[in-house]
Amino acid sequence: MKHIYEKGTSDNVLLLLHGTGGNEHDLLSLGRFIDPDAHLLGVRGSVLENGMPRFFKRLSEGVFDEKDLVVRTRELKDFIDEAAETHQFNRGRVIAVGYSNGANIAASLLFHYKDVLKGAILHHPMVPIRGIELPDMAGLPVFIGAGKYDPLCTKEESEELYRYLRDSGASASVYWQDGGHQLTQHEAEQAREWYKEAIV
């Protein structure tokens, strides 16, 4: 997968996953804001929708192509495994930071694979897939940033994702913003403060 890697000085690795139309550079500044010392691994989605990179196909707005989602989730997991060898970082210290479509593929990693991530910061995610048995996520720290008036990820959707994670044992937290789907500076600050407490 097309990506950029910036070496840090700590053991943590931030896996940066952009929203629709973004690229591997989009969340570098956010990653450095959250953890100035972490290694940064920015990844570009390999699916194109009207020329815009995404991490998996969708059938329509808010309706995911679940078969493609499963395939792309496995591809991303395999890529992380390979990148850990290529760049010589600690595979057990990977924390996802995703926005929108990137948050959805990060959530899908959690839904499909046990111990695939050390933690996750999900900005405006949806429930990636329903009707599957989720792995044990005992104690896994997960931050969900949600907008009370988000037209793409409704309040009900955010709460449903939180319940799935919580019921699978994750230590999940939802941080609500008064706005919509945009990622605000205040939300980024909340994510950073959460990270300082939750990721050790």
UniProtKB/Swiss-Prot annotation:
GO molecular function: hydrolase activity
Active site per database record: S100, D150, H181
Annotated GO biological process: catabolic process; response to toxic substance
EC top class named in words: hydrolase
Gene3D superfamilies in UniProt: alpha/beta hydrolase
GO cellular component, one term: cytoplasm
Localisation: Cytoplasm
Name of the featured protein: Putative hydrolase MhqD
